A protein has these predicted regions:
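Composition- and surface-driven signal marking solvent-exposed, interaction-prone regions
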Residues: 34-37, 161-162, 266
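C-terminal lobe and adjacent flexible extensions of AdoMet/dcAdoMet transferase-like proteins
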Residues: 3-9, 33, 178-323
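Anionic group-transfer/hydrolysis microenvironments
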Residues: 111, 151, 194
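The AdoMet/dcAdoMet-binding core of the Class I SAM-like
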Residues: 2-137, 154
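Beta-strand cores of modular interaction/reader domains in eukaryotic scaffold and signaling proteins
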Residues: 20-23, 47-48, 107, 145-149, ...
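Short amphipathic alpha-helical segments embedded in low-complexity Lys/Glu-rich regions
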Residues: 17-24, 48-53, 149-157, 162-164, ...
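Conserved Class I SAM-dependent methyltransferase catalytic core
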Residues: 119-174
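Intrinsically disordered, low-complexity regions enriched in proline, serine, glycine
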Residues: 13-14, 33, 58-59, 118-119, ...
Length: 323
């Protein structure tokens, strides 16, 4: 979150005022913690909502106990049902009525344990992805920002969601932060300056009325029944090719490393390089870090500056990439 805020200047316009933020599927609270560190403003109000579940594989607030005790401006929201379930209609209506048009920044960091079948992670996440977007639209202030974690962008439902966001925000970015593992499909959609639709209230009422249908299906396969803009689709294909190639190269590098006769030596060298890059990452974003003078620095391995592709939007439905 620190990297995203820095590279896309998400917080600059709030430097001289207080903020209200809402964090969906937030447990154990990493995004909130990052923002409280960056802002250092006790007058800000942070709201976190995540599924309350007894299973250990469901991220909760247990690891954040000390942090929550030390930050009175962080509020845990559980919704109407008391369990923070984003798939429940009652909770959507509750958040819409309580927080409508009030949140400057909304984040959505939801995910599942995909280790059983990584090939279906995009489909499995489709309902949660859709739910997070709907909750964001229910609470977003006009001109506000939204950060959404996604995985692959291949299925129609995910593409439809990105298209929807591109019509509701002034600019939309796809970003793969340096702190996100290259071999992982994880990436973030950053939406800036929410443009409230003229028919906003009727749109939200219609969505809420039909929201119960989300739980009647295994996956969401489609949102729109029309063909999307060709330029929009072409840009997504380009981004998928770039990020996919990075994944393939990293996975192949890992396989070759494990099969190498000099495996131990190469692993140690790789670890030193990674430590060096982590130190420079912390220095770049002005974060405290342990600087070990015994670490062999590599002068030409500085973390590259982010590059924004497609500086000038060529149509109303466009996305930019931060690579």
């Amino acid at each position: 979150m620190i990297e995203i805020c820095s590279e896309l200047k998400l917080l600059e316009k709030y430097n001289n005022c207080n903020m209200k933020t809402f964090h969906l599927a937030e447990g154990p609270g990493g995004f909130i913690e990052a923002l409280t560190y960056l802002r250092s403003n006790n007058e800000d109000q942070y709201y976190g909502m995540t599924l309350i579940d007894g299973n250990d594989y469901v991220p909760g607030w247990k690891k954040s106990k000390t942090f929550l005790e030390n930050h009175n401006n962080v509020n845990i929201e559980t919704g109407s049902t008391g369990n923070g379930d984003l798939l429940q209609k009652e909770n959507l209506l509750y958040c819409y009525e309580k927080y409508k048009n009030t949140m400057d920044l909304i984040t959505a960091d939801g995910g599942f344990d995909f280790s059983i079948d990584f090939n279906k992670q995009e489909l499995v996440a489709s309902k949660l992805l859709f739910a997070q977007v709907v909750f964001a639209l229910a609470m977003q202030k006009n001109g506000g920002e939204f950060v959404l974690k996604v995985f692959d962008i291949f299925t129609k439902s995910t593409v439809d969601i990105l298209y929807l966001l591109s019509t509701l925000y002034d600019s939309v970015y796809i970003m793969k932060p340096n702190t996100s593992r290259i071999a992982n499909s994880e990436r973030y959609i950053i939406c800036k300056k929410f443009v409230k639709p003229k028919q906003y209230d009727s749109l939200m009422n219609r969505i809420i009325d039909n929201y119960h249908q989300v739980n009647t299906m295994d996956y969401i396969t489609s949102i729109f029944d029309f063909s999307l803009n060709h330029y929009f689709i072409n840009k997504l294909e380009e981004y998928n090719a770039i990020l996919g190639q990075q994944q393939i190269e990293n996975i192949m590098y890992t396989i070759n490393l494990l099969q190498s006769r000099q495996k131990n030596e190469k692993i140690e060298s790789h670890k030193r390089n990674n430590i060096n890059k982590c130190v420079m990452w912390c220095a770049k974003y002005r974060l405290p870090h342990y600087n070990d003078s015994n670490i062999n620095t590599v002068s030409n391995r500085f973390i590259p500056d982010m590059i924004k592709v497609d500086e000038n939007r060529q149509c109303d439905n466009s996305v930019n990439m931060v690579a």
